[in-house]
C-alpha cells in the first residue's frame, strides 16, 4: 500500500448527501476481485449516459476535474452495503482523499485499509471546502496528514482529527498484511519458542 504523507491535487465537489456504495460502484462491477480497472465504473450510473457515452454534466467528466485526487462530498458518504469495491474504485480512479461531515463506519474503515484518507470536518468547514472545490482547475487543496491540516487555494487552513493508529498506518503505508509483516520477527521468535517448549505439538 502506498504511503500517505502529503497530497496536493484538484478537489472535485460532489454536494450530494447519502451517497451509497451502489452509487460509488454499481453491482455490475462486483464480479471481479481485482483492485485494478474499477475506476471506469466509479459513479458509473451518473457518469455515463444510457448509450455508454460520458455525461458531460457529471463533475468527474468535466476537464477541470478529470484528474481529481480529492473528493469533497455531502454527509453520510459511503452508506449502504459493505462492498470493498467502493474504495477500490475511488483509488483506481486516482482519489486518495474524501472529505465529508460523516462516513458510514464500514466504508470509513475500508478506506484506511486501501490507502485512502477519509476526513471528517464540520458543516461550516465543508461549506468552505465545497466553495474551494467549485473553482475548477484552481480547486487545489493540500492535505498534510502529519500536521493533520487541509490548506485551501487561498492559503487558509483547516485542522482535522484522526485516530492515531489509523494515521500511523497511512503514514507508513501499512495495510493488514503490512501490519502483520511488521511483527514478523516477534512471530518468528514466538513460533521457535513454542516449538522448543512443546515439541509434541
Curated annotation (Swiss-Prot):
EC number(s) of the enzyme?
A: 4.2.1.33
Protein keywords: Amino-acid biosynthesis, Branched-chain amino acid biosynthesis, Leucine biosynthesis, Lyase
Which Pfam families does UniProt cross-reference here?
Aconitase_C (PF00694)
GO CC terms on record?
3-isopropylmalate dehydratase complex
Recorded GO molecular functions are:
3-isopropylmalate dehydratase activity
Q: What does this protein do?
A: Catalyzes the isomerization between 2-isopropylmalate and 3-isopropylmalate, via the formation of 2-isopropylmaleate.
Spell out the subunit comment.
Heterodimer of LeuC and LeuD.
The name this protein goes by in its record: 3-isopropylmalate dehydratase small subunit
Species of origin reads: Sinorhizobium fredii (strain NBRC 101917 / NGR234)
Amino acid at each position: 500500500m502506498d504511503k500517505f504523507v502529503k497530497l496536493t491535487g484538484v478537489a472535485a465537489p460532489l454536494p450530494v448527501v447519502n451517497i451509497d456504495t451502489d452509487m460509488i460502484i454499481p453491482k455490475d462491477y462486483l464480479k471481479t476481485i481485482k483492485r485494478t480497472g474499477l475506476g471506469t465504473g466509479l459513479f458509473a450510473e451518473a457518469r455515463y449516459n444510457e448509450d455508454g457515452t460520458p455525461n458531460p454534466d457529471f463533475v468527474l467528466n468535466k476537464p477541470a476535474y478529470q484528474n481529481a485526487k480529492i473528493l469533497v462530498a455531502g454527509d453520510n458518504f459511503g452508506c449502504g452495503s459493505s462492498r470493498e469495491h467502493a474504495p477500490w474504485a475511488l483509488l483506481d480512479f486516482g482519489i486518495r482523499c474524501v472529505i465529508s461531515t460523516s462516513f458510514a463506519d464500514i466504508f470509513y474503515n475500508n478506506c484506511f485499509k486501501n490507502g485512502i484518507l477519509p476526513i471528517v470536518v464540520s458543516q461550516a468547514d465543508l461549506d468552505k471546502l465545497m466553495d474551494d472545490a467549485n473553482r475548477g482547475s484552481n480547486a487545489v487543496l493540500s492535505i498534510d496528514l502529519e500536521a493533520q491540516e487541509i490548506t485551501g487555494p487561498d492559503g487558509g487552513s483547516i485542522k482535522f482529527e484522526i485516530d492515531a493508529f489509523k494515521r500511523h498506518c497511512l503514514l507508513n503505508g501499512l495495510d493488514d498484511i503490512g501490519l502483520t509483516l511488521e511483527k514478523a520477527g516477534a512471530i518468528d521468535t514466538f513460533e521457535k519458542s513454542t516449538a522448543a517448549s512443546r515439541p509434541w505439538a
